[in-house]
Amino acid sequence: RKWGHPDGVAILLNTKYTKKVYFALRVCAQGGKETLSAEKACIWPVAEEREIKMLQLEHLAWQLPGGESILKGVDMHVPKGKLVVVTGPNGGGKTSLAKLVAGLETPTAGRILFDGEDITGLDITQRARKGIAYAFQQPVRFKGLRVKDLLSLAAGKNTSVNEACSYLSEVGLCARDYIDREVNASLSGGELKRIEIAMVLARGTKLSIFDEPEAGIDLWSFQNLIRVFEKMYEQTKGCILIISHQERILNIADTIVVIKNGQVARTGSRADLLPALLGSADAANPACDVLTSKIEGV
């Protein structure tokens, strides 16, 4: 009946090791019991449910003006509504990847597709209008602007100042203490980092990119940050891309991508890949945060 058949009940069959094919079978009621009548059963194909790729990178490459290759043909995707963590050794190309997706750099080869559209040639402002937000690894200090100015700009003209500043509490900052403060040298790196994350929250974008969000913040703030990402993940209709090698961030990922020497070394679900990175004993230990030495061996 769900597919328009007046007499039947739909049953979905999924082949596990071949291409997914679904069939709807008409089940006929006979003698008060539901049985399958071979001569009366109707079999017809039903459309396959497909994973929607919000972000897709195709053969992405980037090199410095001097000719040094940083990224060498990266292929990966971020599904809609998922949280993907990119990890790997220092200097492997993680931050470069984030900058290319955000529009801060232009790839020397390959394509970037966002929500089905080729955005390779768009700059960071144009991509922001498409729904991409980027939180820098090193936060930017905006002279002459107050915290509430930044949050209001991020949230847009249809959002009140009070509503925009409510996002400060989400990242563990008291709005009353910070709302009128100027974004200058009086703010620590950790405070700036949290303000920048609050700006991303205020925007409510389709794709949120965070480059090592744990850098420069204390343990309490980091624990609060994990709760922020978990809440974003539960509420977002888009997706989240995080650059990190902290175990507690990897532990909330749907997918982990390991970038090494400018290429995708491994990719997989958290359940499949995290034990391989940590070793089964370390994977159960939430106090073990630094993965760099493990990742180097991937």
Regions from the PLM with identified roles:
Residues 55-57, 70-73:
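Conserved structural motif at the start of ABC-family nucleotide-binding domains
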Residues 87-89:
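The feature captures the beta-strand-to-loop junction immediately N-terminal to the Walker
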Residues 102:
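Helix-to-loop junction immediately C-terminal to a conserved catalytic motif
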Residues 110-117, 163:
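Conserved ABC transporter NBD signature motif
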